[in-house]
Amino acid sequence: APFEPRAAAIKAGKLVLQQIHEYARRGMDFAFETTLSGKSYANLLSELKSKGYALHLFFLWIPSPELAIARIKDRVAEGGHHVPAEDVRRRFVRGLRNFFRYESIFDSWMLFGNSKAAPVLIAKRFNGNQEVLDHQEFFKIVGKWATLK
């Protein structure tokens, strides 16, 4: 509902989870977008893994919630949906924390820097082999994560 954006966001999140469970029940392949900030992802990912799903993560990193807030402001000016600044800040912290918390669950992951016009691959892990392509940026991210623990 346009006058109750938080209620609409909660309802939308529940619908996404229902759809994921339905796809998994049918054994269908699927992808979904998330901030990775929710509390239920560890259980969901473990459940999908136990059903034989291969899990692949593309994580888009930005250095600050302020950049996300500025991008949201631009999106709203173009007719997109608004996200309150306090939600952005909370999700920023949780999303980064959960990337490092859950990264071992994924069969593969790619970590992109997303502060420029196009995403830039910083690090990746495939078949258990991790490779850091941009050490300076990767250690900046690890340092940010360490302050959030």
Identify the residue ranges that each predicted region occupies.
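A glycine- and Lys/Arg-enriched "phosphate-lid" helix/loop adjacent to the NTP-binding pocket
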Residues: Y53-N98
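Conserved substrate/cofactor phosphate-moiety recognition/catalytic segment
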Residues: A1-M28
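NTP-dependent small-molecule kinase module
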Residues: Y102-K149
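Helical mechanochemical/support elements of P-loop NTPase systems and associated helical scaffolds
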Residues: A8, A12-V16, S37-S40, A68, ...
